[in-house]
Amino acid sequence: DMEQARQIGMPIDLGAVSAAANACAQKEDLMIFAGNPKAGYEGLATAEGAFKVKKSDWSKDENAFSDVVKGLQHFADKNLRGRYALAVSPDLYAQLQRLQVSTGLLESERIKTLVGGGLYMTPALGLNKAVLVCAEPQNMDLVIGQDLITGYMGSAKLNHEFRVFETALLRIKCKDAVVVFG
């Protein structure tokens, strides 16, 4: 595509580049949330010793808000303070997009305010799951061995081939800083 674009003077089609970047982001999210059981690494949603909250029906009443408060109470009980982040599966994120009676606010807005702005949706959690973390470096971090790089592999059949490479590992230092809703 690069060669053809150069020859005819047209802009390069970056669709494949965008798709590759998206695939890398999805794999990184999967590593962070599910870990790599084959290699013996835990993810946030699979960590042994993480605090588990039996999730109520988030499509009803203020159940989601109440469940998140339970998670934050756990952090308070364990004296964990700092930045909080809540990651939810796409189906749960959709359930949070409804007005709460007598507040005039979406439940997602209330929860986002409760956790200090850190509300994220990720397909890496699958369905009907959420993870709340106290995202401070003393609790967890992402160890980067090799940051994301792109290497030129050569050309074949008028296409230029590249390899995208990264090594990273989630390091959970304090499992009390992870709350799994499921």
Report residues per predicted region:
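Residues forming anionic-ligand binding surfaces in small-molecule and nucleic-acid pockets
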Residues: D1
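Sequence/fold signature of self-assembling virion shell proteins
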Residues: L99-G182
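Residue-level signal for secondary-structure boundary sites
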Residues: E28, A94, L170-I172
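Extended, solvent-exposed, turn-rich assembly/linker loops in the middle of proteins
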Residues: A45-R110
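Long, histidine/aromatic-enriched segments associated with O2/redox biology
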Residues: S18-C24, K52, R83, S108-T113, ...
